[in-house]
Amino acid sequence: MARIGDGGDLLKCSFCGKSQKQVKKLIAGPGVYICDECIDLCNEIIEEELADADDVKLDELPKPAEIRDFLENYVIGQDTAKKTLAVAVYNHYKRIQAGDKARDARGETVELAKSNILMLGPTGCGKTYLAQTLAKMLNVPFAIADATALTEAGYVGEDVENILLKLIQAADYDVKRAETGIIYIDEVDKIARKSENPSITRDVSGEGVQQALLKILEGTQASVPPQGGRKHPHQEFIQIDTTNVLFIVAGAFAGLEKIVSDRVGKRGLGFGAEVKSKADIDTTDHFAEVMPEDLIKFGLIPEFIGRLPIVASVTNLDRESLIKILSEPKNALVKQYTRLFEMDGVELEFSQDALEAIADQAIHRGTGARGLRAIMEEVLQPVMYDIPSRDDVAKVVVTGETVIDNVLPTIVPRKPSRTERRDKSA
């Protein structure tokens, strides 16, 4: 117990024995005292124990095959992209658990560098959804940012640090947790510079943004304004280390297929070359053959490409895939709308030709999987307006004719109960 020292009336810490003159603060309890230094030490011990408890052990980290199987439950097709992402994500979090360092067979320390991901492919093919599903499986903070809203520091628009603020907000302002999250930057093809040659004028929303993103992609200690917006000198900043943040950068890259085609086509010159028509070549096949030189020609700077070593490409969804997307995944659209109708006590049914017609419309509109919900809304909107006000409907059946000819779905009336028949006859 803390007592008055022999040399005078000085109080002492009950834990370390230091007098009140040797410490900044001495806090009194019932018969005991504790100094500020002992409090700090206790806090450090508690934080270390909590961190150890929160860390996912290596044997608990899902293996690439398990990650791919999980994605299969939610995303139809894109098998190559799933495997690429599964391996990349597994290696990324394995690296974090090793503390950025690992020892080889000779006991020497090996630095493990971060590998961010570049996703290429047409709109509506599942790029964003793949990243969202990954974050959901791993239970890590996830943030989506739009590259088109970003500008170089000092110009009207968002600073790149605002991307990090979204991640911190997704982690409920737990910075330590945010530092192992995933950031998905969409529409990155829209920040390509106008020419593959460096510009002498400022390109504040193109090359300037790429330059600004370099540091956070690679890993840096960033200062983030807690309320967003521009930085100003009287504002306190949140410090976040992006070394262990996984960046998935994506875009449709319209026009890149021509650059790849021109490069690949040069190999086929000469009398013995195989001649292919444009109809024989699927544009999405070209994304699988993308090289850094193609991305530089498109308008990405070499330093930016160098920080995105893993390339995953998604392909256009065919008719069969779109039909599967409507009904097979765990949260398929048909299942979602069926549940909505069940809440009103009505059964909803889609015929096979209705699903085929919805898929055909999505292909015709060129919207991919993203357009399926809009078509479903158009088809079901009249009955969704009418059904809640009625109690005589048992079932709604959507057929191919409903989708193609824009006619109302078939409504199956509910048979009156015995009590209702008795009341009516009375």
Swiss-Prot record:
Protein family according to the UniProt entry = Belongs to the ClpX chaperone family.
The record's section on NCBIfam families has:
clpX (TIGR00382), PRK05342.1 (NF003745)
Ranges of residues in domain ClpX-type ZB: 1-54
What does the function comment of this entry state?
A: ATP-dependent specificity component of the Clp protease. It directs the protease to specific substrates. Can perform chaperone functions in the absence of ClpP.
Q: What is this protein called?
A: ATP-dependent Clp protease ATP-binding subunit ClpX
TM segment ranges: none
State the organism named in the record.
Mycobacteroides abscessus (strain ATCC 19977 / DSM 44196 / CCUG 20993 / CIP 104536 / JCM 13569 / NCTC 13031 / TMC 1543 / L948) (Mycobacterium abscessus)
Cellular component, GO, one term? HslUV protease complex
Report a single Gene Ontology molecular function: ATP hydrolysis activity
Record flagged with keyword Phosphoprotein: no
Q: Which InterPro entries match?
A: AAA+_ATPase, ATP-dep_Clp_protease_ClpX, ATPase_AAA_core, Clp_ATPase_C, Clp_protease_ATP-bd_su_ClpX, ClpX_bact, P-loop_NTPase, Znf_CppX_C4
CDD domains reported for this sequence: RecA-like_ClpX
Locate the residues binding Zn(2+): 13, 16, 35, 38
Q: How does it assemble?
A: Component of the ClpX-ClpP complex. Forms a hexameric ring that, in the presence of ATP, binds to fourteen ClpP subunits assembled into a disk-like structure with a central cavity, resembling the structure of eukaryotic proteasomes.
Q: Which UniProt keywords apply?
A: ATP-binding, Chaperone, Metal-binding, Nucleotide-binding, Zinc
User: Which positions are annotated as binding ATP?
Assistant: 122-129
* GO term, biological process aspect, one: proteolysis involved in protein catabolic process
Is Nucleotide-binding given among the entry's keywords?
A: yes
| Pfam families per UniProt | AAA_2, ClpB_D2-small, zf-C4_ClpX
Question: Per its UniProt record, what PANTHER family does this chain match?
Answer: ATP-DEPENDENT CLP PROTEASE ATP-BINDING SUBUNIT CLPX-LIKE, MITOCHONDRIAL, ATP-DEPENDENT CLP PROTEASE ATP-BINDING SUBUNIT CLPX-LIKE, MITOCHONDRIAL-RELATED
The taxonomy runs: Bacteria, Bacillati, Actinomycetota, Actinomycetes, Mycobacteriales
